Design a protein with these regions (language model features):
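Phosphate-binding site recognition
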Residues: 1-330, 334
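A cross-kingdom feature that marks ATP-driven nucleic-acid transaction machinery
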Residues: 293, 302-465
C-alpha cells in the first residue's frame, strides 16, 4: 500500500492549484514518517519538477546539492554538474526556468536549509515579491520540524509571512483510514494495528500484517534485525544531539509518569532541563502536553506520548530486551506482551471513540464545540477521577460524558452510575448525555437502560461501520 494512501483530498487540492498556472507557494509540514514526501512525489509525477532535498550540513554543501538538482533537471545526461557561485545565482536560474512554463520546485527538509543558510527565507521573500509572483513557479516548502514551519515559515515574524498560497499539515491517519490497509482483518486486529503504528503509513507498511498481528509483531518488531526495532533509536539519533536524555524521558512517560515532577524524578534531571527536552519532543510530534478540557494550562497539565509507535515500543521492547536477544520472545510473548495489550489499548481506544463522535457530530444531541478528557478531584470522596470523554457545547450547558472500555468483559449498569457521579463532580452542565463505548459489549441491564433513553451504547464493531 502506497504511503500517500488516504491522501486523495490533499492530492486533489495540490493538482487544482497546479492547473491554475499562476504562482503558488505551498507549505507542507508534519512529523517524520507521516507521508509528506510520498504525497509530494505522487503529486509531481508527470510534471516538470526540480526536487531539492536539503541536507543537515553546511550552506556550501546545500548549494552544491541545489546546483545538482537544477542541472539534473536542465541537462539530465550530464555526468557532473557545475556549481552555482551563490544562492542568488541558483534562484535566478529558477526564475528563468519558470518564466514561461509551469514548473514545480520542491525544497524538502526546508528547516535544514534555513539552519545552514539563515538568510534563505529573506532571499526567497525577495525573489517571490520581485520575480516569482508574476511567474509560473509552483514552489513547495516541506519540513518535519513543526514548530519551525509554524513560526519561521507560517508565522508573522517570518520573512515568508503572507507569501504562502496554501498550507497542509499532514497528520497520521485516523483509525478508520488505517483500517483500509487491511480490509480483510477483524475490527480488533485493525484497532491493534492503529494502536501500534499510530496511523503512520510508513509504520503500517513496515509492520506488514498478513494474517496475524502477533506474528507480525514477532517478525517485524520484536526482532533485532527488523526495521521497526531500530526505528526509535535511529530517529532520535537523526534528530537530536543528546538522545540518551530524550530516551529516558520517553521511557518514563511510556511507563506511566505524566506530570513534570514524576518525569523529572525518573530521569534524574532538574525540572528546567526536562522541560526543555519535552518541548523538543513535542515539536517532533513524539510527546504532547494536555490539560483537562475547558480548563486553562496549570497544575493539572500532564505529558503523554503523542506517537503511538513510540508509546508501544517503549512500553514493550525494553522490558523484553533479554528475551529478544536470547531468541525466547516467541515463548514469552503471550504473558509479557499479549496479555497487556488491552491495558495498553485503553488510551488508544479513548482517542478512537473521540474520533467516532467527531465523525458523527451532526447526529449528536448537542452542537459540539470540542472534545477531550477531564480529570480532577472528587472533593467529597477525596480521590482523583478521570472522565474519558467530555464533549463541550458551542453554547448552553448540555454536555456529552463518555466512558471507554477496551476489554472483553461486558460493561454493566454500574459504569453508567459511575459516569453520572463523575458528571456531578465535573459540574459544568445542567444536562448530560451519556455514551459508553465497549469492546466486549454490554449486560442486559445496561441494554435496557439504553432502551429507556438513559445512555447511548457503542461497540468496537460500531466504530468501524
Amino acid at each position: 500500500m502506497s504511503q500517500f494512501y488516504c491522501r486523495e483530498n490533499e492530492l486533489r487540492k495540490l493538482n487544482k492549484r497546479y492547473e491554475g498556472d499562476k504562482f503558488e507557494c505551498i507549505v507542507i509540514y508534519g512529523r517524520r514518517r507521516v507521508g509528506k514526501t510520498a504525497l509530494i512525489n505522487e503529486f509531481c509525477k508527470g510534471k516538470p519538477t526540480i526536487f531539492f532535498s536539503a541536507l543537515n550540513t553546511t550552506g556550501k554543501e546545500n548549494l552544491e546539492a541545489l546546483s545538482k538538482s537544477i542541472m539534473t533537471f536542465e541537462r539530465p545526461d550530464m555526468e557532473s554538474a557545475p556549481e552555482f557561485r551563490s544562492y542568488d545565482a541558483a534562484l535566478d536560474e529558477l526564475t528563468a526556468l519558470s518564466k514561461e512554463k509551469r514548473m514545480v520546485f520542491v525544497i524538502d527538509e526546508y528547516p535544514y536549509l534555513a539552519k545552514a543558510k539563515p538568510a534563505i527565507s529573506a532571499m526567497l521573500q525577495h525573489i517571490i515579491d520581485h520575480k516569482w509572483m508574476e511567474s509560473k513557479m509552483y514552489l513547495i516548502l516541506c519540513g518535519s520540524s513543526m514548530s519551525f514551519m509554524e513560526s519561521q515559515v507560517l508565522g508573522k515574524e517570518s520573512p515568508l509571512y503572507g507569501r504562502r498560497t496554501a498550507q497542509f499539515k499532514i497528520a497520521p491517519l485516523d483509525y478508520k483510514e488505517t483500517a483500509v490497509f487491511h480490509p480483510n482483518l477483524s475490527d480488533e486486529d485493525n484497532s491493534l494495528i492503529y494502536g501500534i503504528t499510530g496511523g503512520v503509513p510508513h509504520y503500517i507498511n513496515k509492520l506488514d500484517v498478513r494474517d496475524s498481528v502477533d506474528e507480525a509483531l514477532l517478525d517485524n518488531l520484536f526482532d533485532r534485525s527488523s526495521y521497526l526495532y531500530e526505528e526509535p533509536a535511529n530517529l532520535l539519533k537523526q534528530e537530536l544531539r543528546e538522545p540518551a536524555i530524550y530516551n529516558a524521558i520517553i521511557k518514563a512517560i511510556a511507563e506511566g509518569a505524566s506530570r513534570l515532577n514524576d518525569i523529572t524524578m525518573k530521569v534524574g534531571e532538574e525540572n528546567s532541563v526536562v522541560s526543555k527536552y519535552l518541548k523538543t519532543l513535542i515539536d517532533l510530534g513524539i510527546a504532547k502536553k494536555e490539560t483537562p478540557i475547558s480548563e486553562k494550562p496549570g497544575k493539572k497539565t500532564i505529558y503523554l506520548l503523542a506517537d503511538n509507535f513510540f508509546r508501544f515500543w517503549y512500553r514493550f521492547v525494553p522490558v523484553n530486551m533479554s528475551a529478544i536477544d536470547s531468541g525466547r520472545i516467541a515463548k514469552t510473548y503471550p504473558h509479557t506482551v499479549k496479555q497487556y495489550l488491552p491495558d495498553y489499548m485503553g488510551l488508544i481506544f479513548e482517542k478512537m471513540c473521540q474520533d467516532y463522535l467527531l465523525y458523527y457530530a451532526d447526529k449528536l444531541p448537542i452542537e459540539l464545540n470540542e472534545i477531550g478528557q477531564w480529570w480532577g478531584t472528587d472533593s467529597k470522596k477525596k480521590k482523583q477521577i478521570q472522565i474519558d470523554i467530555v464533549g463541550t457545547p458551542v453554547e448552553g450547558k448540555e454536555y456529552i460524558i463518555g466512558s471507554c472500555k477496551y476489554r472483553n468483559e461486558k460493561i454493566g449498569v454500574d459504569e453508567l452510575e459511575l459516569i453520572r457521579d463523575y458528571a456531578s463532580v465535573f459540574g459544568k452542565g445542567n444536562t448530560y448525555h451519556y455514551y459508553i463505548f465497549s469492546k466486549g459489549g454490554f449486560t442486559d441491564g445496561l441494554l435496557q437502560a439504553r432502551e429507556r433513553g438513559e445512555v447511548q451504547l457503542i461497540t468496537l464493531e460500531d466504530l468501524y461501520k
